[in-house]
Amino acid sequence: MPPPIQGYGFGESVDLRSFLYDRLVATRIRYMGNKHDVAPVVAELVRRRRGDRPFLDVFCGLCSVGGAVARTGRRVVGNDVQSFASLVARCLIATVELPPSPEEFKRALRCSHLYNERRLLERFGGDVAREACILADADGDAYRRAYASWRHAANDESVAAEIDEITRGGNRRPYRLATLTFAWGYFGLRQAIAIDSMRFAIDRARETGRLTPAGADWALVALLQAASCASASPGHFAQYLRPTSDEGFVRILRQRRRDIWAQFLHEAGELEPYGDPEWRRGNSVMRSDALKIWDDLDGFSSQDWIVYADPPYSKDHYSRYYHVLETLTRYDYPAAAGMGRYRPDRFATPFSLKTCVEAAMNELCCAIAERGYTFILSYPSNGLLNADCGVDPGELLREHFGRVDLRMRRPTSHSTLGARHGSARNSVDELLWVAC
């Protein structure tokens, strides 16, 4: 176990390990925005505030901060604009029901899974057999030919038209979104068929009562975890690995050989929420733009909130890195475009635009300050606001709040999001302010 984390302006050494769970993360979904290092510091800052004040995380992501705050017993509300993130947050911090066991999932899902799979194999059986031979022989040249010839929603008008027809109310069965959009890209064809069949089984189990609504949500989280583990991509979903080199093909081959059903059952056995049932019963999750949440929050409660924000800090729009997870969660058959097979309606945040980030941060601060809430802001030293625009976040906070304290400056490293050239990580300082 690491040594106690010292200082951070608390006035004495504080052992922040009590806020960390035995597991490093509560979910294995690929996500680069987790704040595992910052989370215990935020939890200690929250603990020191008046005991009945609830905690709001306006960019909650996969809830590493909300999970740390669980140890304080504070009520937590998480918010995220992405559907997949709000689903995970709901399961981890706001669902009383524990996840079903792998055996319970088997009983609830297997028959429907096999039904959808059989329907898809009637159409794609020959293609699946060819893929299996290529993978068994580890034939890189054959793989490259098959990859180049595969037709999908982003490169074929007839497949795109089929997607559009489904969106307009056409026959959705058998489920085939991943097969038509992501096969021979992020996933193998057999894997995409399995993902679609798992999603069909989850929806059927929800409809028929074989799984409770919460149980079906847990199943979907396990499926997202299985998809994350099986995806042939560099730690995110902005792009997938292409077989342009022998090394790349070896990496793809390793991922293609993962069995989605087996991976799903493994992930199901790893699911575990934060906190105890009574704590989770008092929590809730919202799905909204962080700049538009405030009117809803005003009607939600009149309490004096402690608000935490970890806004996007780079020019990269994060929705691009998670579009596959978003599509598998919403399962709405969007159009697909480009090499990444992106959905066209990906969320774009002003926090990632150089011309808009200062105004967005001012708008966020104004909404919090005018309501008299305490604001905890996390931002790196190389963020778009300070490094590119020359605006000191601390000074910006002082324009809105009477007291602003820098409570943490900690060296860390950030992923370069799969950049092809240079270091995979950048050394930066993680900064944390408290404003009230």
Please report, for each region that a protein language model flagged, where it lies by residue.
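S-adenosyl-L-methionine
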Residues: P2-L56, S64-R71, S86-V88
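Conserved phosphoryl-transfer catalytic core
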Residues: C91-P174, T181
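SAM-dependent methyltransferase catalytic-core segment centered on the flexible catalytic loop
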Residues: S314-R371
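Conserved glycine-centered beta->alpha loop in an early N-terminal alpha/beta scaffold
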Residues: F59
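Class I S-adenosyl-L-methionine
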Residues: G394-C436
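SAM-dependent nucleic-acid methyltransferase catalytic core
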Residues: R17-F19, A39, E44, S64, ...
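Conserved Class I SAM-dependent methyltransferase catalytic core
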Residues: F351-D405
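Conserved SAM-binding motif I beta-strand of class I
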Residues: V76-D80
